[in-house]
Amino acid sequence: MADEDCQNLTVDDIVALIDEAYKTLYNNRAICPTMATTLTFMAKTNEGMLLAHLGDSRIYQIRKGEGVVFQTKDHSLVNDLLDSGAIKPEEAKNHPQGNVITKCLFVTDDKDRYMAPTITLIRDIKPRDVFMLCTDGVYGLVSNDDMVEILTSDNALEERTKELVALCRNSHDNNTAYIIEIGGVDDDSTDKKENVTYTIGKPRRPIKRRICDFVRETLRFVKQNKHLE
């Protein structure tokens, strides 16, 4: 997908992308009919960073001097229990069902079963902000304090990545991450902009060919490029 296409992405486009991912899983069901996966997505648009996620893989936004300024909220049973008041925060830390997720991509051809992602537009972006998309095998081993210290250091991004690799070396879980550092922003005002979270329905409209091509290229890229493993 060309840069100008990403810049014009809309929330509906993201929903269409995820619908296409569901179709891709279904079309490859012969490989593993029970396969499922979490999802994180990020694209730089004219309005800011457009993020989407399903499950407990996370997106962090980290800023030097401020630490973690944004973090996605896991789609998990524990978070549902917290939100309902059924458990207290201290009970959530070591909850026996801490690894149970409530949303994911999975094999189905029933569009009514597609799970809606959480989509957030990050408008508060500063130069040198670091975004990290990662699985629970990373954040389960690396504390927020260590994450902030490493990713906001003055070392080259490659060196910071190697430091994270070292911390995840003994993980028995999937520990994949993609790290992006913001070089500059179009609007350098000091005014804080509010982020926007969207409530997603299930619009059904023809998906643009460029979006389909982008999904295929993304899946091919993920297969060929693995970080922090």
Regions found by a protein language model. Give the residues of each.
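PP2C/PPM-type serine/threonine phosphatase catalytic domain
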Residues: 1-229
